[in-house]
């Protein structure tokens, strides 16, 4: 990626971001094609029928994505596609009833890059549609723990969307080292978690923003931002879900 925002799912993909000043949005780089049944919590967030961000099902009525994906808070602007490996067809399309960005979200620094989407109707769960568990506030991700990120974003750092879902496995990155690597971009805060390889080569990229970063069986991050895609010594940055667990519970009762 050049520079991007993303939400991630620690084990499958990498990082993704949305264009803004020096940041860009992303797609999976160095990953592999994956079936939706392997990541049934993954959804495509769409505008006018076109994919632009990812998201994660956390209950039959709620999806968690990145706040930078929902700067327009009019729910009529969005739908989600769930249950399909193909972002252009299959699965189900569900309207969004309300868009609730985190009240402390900062669009300049991407701090608290979370947004809850209340769906217009409850969705039924199946092999290809399922909620993912959330970490509690006290839970942490150890340095080097493998995570999976998934999405339909750019695979070649050229902002060209994938039609079929992809994922990448990346290790969590030491927080202090991540902050030092990105010190000239934006501050890496406690509300963020980093993942990637020092050598680069695997990451999320344009179009993956808002998607899941999964460690074990829990959603530990949301693809938020990064400096380029899959570049050496520049890990991807995700919004750390455990830090807003109470807010998610208060808003969604999940």
Curated annotation (Swiss-Prot):
Catalytic activity: Preferential cleavage: Arg-|-Xaa, Lys-|-Xaa
Proregion residues excised on maturation: 21-27
A cellular component annotation (GO) from this entry: extracellular region
Residues with site note (Required for specificity): 203
Domain Peptidase S1, residue spans: 28-253
Intracellular or extracellular location(s): Secreted, Extracellular space
Disulfide bond in keyword set: yes
Pfam families, alphabetized: Trypsin
Keyword Amino-acid biosynthesis appears in the UniProt entry: no
GO biological process: digestion; proteolysis
Catalytic activity, EC: 3.4.21.4
SMART domains for this protein: Tryp_SPc (SM00020)
GO molecular function: serine-type endopeptidase activity
Alphabetical list of PROSITE patterns matching this protein: TRYPSIN_DOM, TRYPSIN_HIS, TRYPSIN_SER
Induction profile: By blood feed.
Active site: 68, 113, 209
Family assignment from sequence similarity: Belongs to the peptidase S1 family.
General function of this protein: Major function may be to aid in digestion of the blood meal.
Name of the protein in question: Trypsin 3A1
Organism expressing this protein natively: Aedes aegypti
């Amino acid at each position: 990626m050049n520079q991007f925002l993303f939400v991630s799912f620690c084990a499958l993909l990498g990082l993704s971001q949305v264009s803004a000043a020096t940041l860009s949005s992303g797609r999976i780089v160095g990953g592999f094609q994956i079936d939706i049944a392997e990541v049934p919590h993954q959804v495509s967030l769409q505008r006018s029928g076109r994919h632009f961000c990812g998201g994660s099902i956390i209950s039959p009525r709620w999806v968690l994505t990145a706040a930078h994906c929902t700067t327009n808070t009019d729910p009529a602007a969005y739908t989600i596609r769930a249950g399909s490996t193909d972002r252009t067809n299959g699965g189900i399309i569900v309207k969004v009833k309300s868009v609730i960005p985190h009240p402390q979200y900062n669009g300049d620094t991407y701090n608290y890059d979370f947004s809850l989407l209340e769906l217009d109707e409850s969705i039924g769960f199946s092999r290809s549609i399922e909620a993912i568990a959330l970490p509690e506030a006290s839970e942490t991700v150890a340095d080097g723990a493998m995570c999976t990120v998934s999405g339909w974003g750019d695979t070649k750092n050229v902002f060209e969307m994938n039609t079929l879902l992809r994922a990448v496995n990346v290790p969590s990155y030491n927080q202090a080292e991540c902050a030092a690597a990105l010190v000239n971009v934006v501050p890496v805060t406690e509300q963020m978690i980093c993942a990637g390889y020092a050598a680069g080569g695997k990451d999320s990229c344009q179009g993956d923003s808002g998607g899941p970063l999964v460690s074990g069986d829990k959603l530990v991050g949301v693809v938020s931002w990064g400096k380029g895609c899959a570049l050496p010594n520049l890990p991807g940055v995700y919004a750390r879900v455990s830090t807003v667990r109470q807010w998610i519970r208060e808003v969604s009762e999940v």
